[in-house]
């Protein structure tokens, strides 16, 4: 039995994924043997079936747990992070998805790594979020948090959307395109990356605006400070929607205004001491794989 800095640890699994049951229960037993209290969120508990661990609503985890360990992919981490951000509960991610930009650990090696992390050997990284609000005729009609990005997209309509972008009250440009992405450094490796945006190190206090298939090729991605306030005015739309982390969405109408700004709270991620952001990029994006294969 080892020592741990965390007295109560919440375990949260990717819902409706049959592969998480065994590793999650094994992890719960491992933590219990270390003298840690383990709680499960209600959706995870419902998926894995009857067990001896206390079950609480996801919102209650923030009030009860000192740490949350998430088994799943980046989507699971995004959802949990948005819920727990008001409580400053640190997160550790164990990858059960595909790429896993946010989930450092693997199921095969998690125990050796957790031994060190639970004893205090970890790196703390604070990641920014965005708040977005839609106003219509002066009234707020939609408000949500985003860890990755806020996306305005034309949806299934064949026509482009037309909008104006203002930053800190100053007109910047007009845009005719399939959409616009406003991303955090965390979200720079998601939809923004596939749309031609730059990769931002997560330690930077920046945001990026990335047009999606702009009609004018001079509409390029731009990088702005994290303290900027972005206002988007919708001029023409048919079926345009706004998405936050591909999770929540809302139908936009002409003359709606979208405000995007930095959230005052941050997400606290815990990494192993040997964590390297650049090594993670090499592994996830396959950088230099051909050179390594053909090197002499």
Swiss-Prot record:
EC number of this enzyme: 2.7.1.23
The organism's place on the tree of life at top rank: Bacteria
Binding site for NAD(+): 74-75, 148-149, 176, 178, 189-194
Co-factor requirement: a divalent metal cation
Record's keyword terms, sorted: ATP-binding, Cytoplasm, Kinase, NAD, NADP, Nucleotide-binding, Transferase
Compartment list: Cytoplasm
A single MF term (Gene Ontology): NAD+ kinase activity
Gene3D superfamilies according to UniProt: Probable inorganic polyphosphate/atp-NAD kinase, domain 1, Probable inorganic polyphosphate/atp-NAD kinase, domain 2
Segments traversing the membrane: none
Chief location bin: cytoplasm
Any single GO CC term annotated in Swiss-Prot or TrEMBL for this entry: cytoplasm
Pfam families named among the record's database cross-references: NAD_kinase (PF01513), NAD_kinase_C (PF20143)
Catalytic activity: NAD(+) + ATP = ADP + NADP(+) + H(+)
SUPFAM superfamilies: NAD kinase/diacylglycerol kinase-like (SSF111331)
A biological process from GO: NADP biosynthetic process
Catalytic residues in the record: 74 (proton acceptor)
PANTHER family to which the protein is assigned, alphabetical: NAD KINASE
Function of the molecule: Involved in the regulation of the intracellular balance of NAD and NADP, and is a key enzyme in the biosynthesis of NADP. Catalyzes specifically the phosphorylation on 2'-hydroxyl of the adenosine moiety of NAD to yield NADP.
Assigned protein family: Belongs to the NAD kinase family.
Protein name (record): NAD kinase
Originating species: Nitrosomonas eutropha (strain DSM 101675 / C91 / Nm57)
